């Protein structure tokens, strides 16, 4: 039977410890400035993140003008637009405390309709748009995760230490070649269990089998230059995604990806015109789940143990039987 290592009160204190340490180090090591973020954007701007392309945003109209607005899914596009508007230069970046609602999320131990993450974005030069630069950035972020685990171990030694010294890089195609008989999700479990920490490169495009490792919107990540950070979760005994990130599309890759997904209508949106006409800066960015981070480092079995959300009665009952106490 699962037993949380902390009381609810102790957990709340530790959550602040996790978030404060990580935010401070993320800003310092990636040279990011914190900015205020929107909870909603106009529909016509095209700034909302449409994730895998099928999730429905929450829509409402504004009394004053009748304009249609959308609650954000993430700030993947907004951040790039903001870097342009605020006059940032190559090597400079921003981050924000992003809160979102994803109404179509399938609820389970690691997914909630409420999303909280550190959303960050940084301007890059054309020659930086390489797998090597992507990997260097991943190593920087992984270094923060390692130091966070050490920091928490000093305060809460009973949490233990599980992260390996190094994170392993693997492409989604290499994973398919290694585990052709497994589903993409099971491949993630296998590789994360083997190494403890992995970064899967290249998500969104079709593999040689014709299947995708996972879906990605066509208009923010370059599918050849993106990926996910996965850890092996010691309590759940499964792979556990901490971050999705990548070098963003330039005019060439955006044009190709919009054509592949049959979304040519998006070319008329302000954001997409900015990419296709080389107005918006080239960037790298990502989202790092705050509740996911707390769930991993505080060794929790359910995301509802580290965030306040709404859960169906049957799910709450099931958790109660497993000795999992949701906020």
UniProtKB/Swiss-Prot annotation:
Cellular component per GO, a single term: cytosol
Keyword terms of this UniProt record: Amino-acid biosynthesis, Asparagine biosynthesis, ATP-binding, Cytoplasm, Ligase, Nucleotide-binding
Major subcellular site: cytoplasm
Enzyme Commission code(s) on record: 6.3.1.1
Catalytic reactions of this protein: L-aspartate + NH4(+) + ATP = L-asparagine + AMP + diphosphate + H(+)
Superkingdom to which the source organism belongs: Bacteria
GO biological process: L-asparagine biosynthetic process
InterPro entries, A to Z: aa-tRNA-synth_II, aa-tRNA-synth_II/BPL/LPL, AsnA
Pathway(s) per entry: Amino-acid biosynthesis; L-asparagine biosynthesis; L-asparagine from L-aspartate (ammonia route): step 1/1
PROSITE patterns, per database record: AA_TRNA_LIGASE_II
A Pfam family per the record: AsnA
Protein's cellular compartments: Cytoplasm
GO MF annotations in UniProt: aspartate-ammonia ligase activity; ATP binding; catalytic activity, acting on a protein; transferase activity
Top-tier EC class: ligase
SUPFAM superfamilies membership: Class II aaRS and biotin synthetases
Similarity field: Belongs to the class-II aminoacyl-tRNA synthetase family. AsnA subfamily.
Protein known as: Aspartate--ammonia ligase
Organism of derivation: Bacillus cereus (strain AH820)
């Amino acid at each position: 039977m699962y037993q949380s290592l902390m009381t609810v009160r102790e957990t709340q204190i530790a959550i602040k410890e996790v978030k404060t340490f990580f935010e401070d180090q993320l800003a310092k090591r990636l040279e990011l400035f914190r900015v205020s973020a929107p909870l909603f954007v106009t529909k016509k701007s095209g700034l909302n993140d449409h994730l895998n392309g099928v999730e429905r945003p929450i829509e409402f109209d504004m009394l004053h003008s009748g304009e249609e607005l959308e609650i954000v899914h993430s700030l993947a596009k907004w951040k790039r637009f903001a870097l342009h508007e605020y006059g940032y230069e190559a090597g400079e970046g921003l981050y924000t405390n992003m809160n979102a609602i994803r109404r179509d999320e399938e609820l389970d131990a690691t997914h909630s309709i409420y999303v909280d993450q550190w959303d960050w974005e940084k301007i890059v030069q054309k020659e930086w748009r390489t797998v090597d630069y992507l990997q260097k950035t991943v190593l920087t972020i992984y270094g923060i995760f390692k130091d966070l685990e050490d920091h928490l171990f000093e305060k809460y030694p009973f949490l233990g230490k599980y992260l390996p010294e190094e994170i392993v890089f693997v492409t989604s195609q290499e994973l398919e070649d290694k585990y052709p008989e497994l589903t993409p999700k099971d491949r993630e479990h296998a590789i994360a269990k083997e190494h403890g920490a992995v970064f899967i490169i290249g998500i969104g495009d079709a593999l040689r089998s014709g299947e995708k490792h996972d879906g990605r919107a066509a208009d923010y990540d370059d599918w050849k230059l993106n990926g996910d950070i996965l850890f092996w979760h010691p309590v759940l005994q499964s792979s556990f995604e901490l971050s999705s990130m990548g070098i963003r599309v330039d005019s060439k890759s955006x044009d190709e990806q919009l054509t592949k997904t049959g979304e040519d209508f998006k070319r008329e949106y302000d954001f997409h015109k900015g990419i296709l006409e080389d107005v918006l800066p080239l960037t790298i960015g990502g989202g790092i789940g705050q509740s996911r981070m707390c769930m991993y480092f505080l060794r929790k079995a359910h995301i509802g143990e580290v965030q306040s959300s709404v859960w169906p009665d049957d799910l709450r009952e099931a958790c109660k039987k497993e000795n999992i106490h949701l906020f």
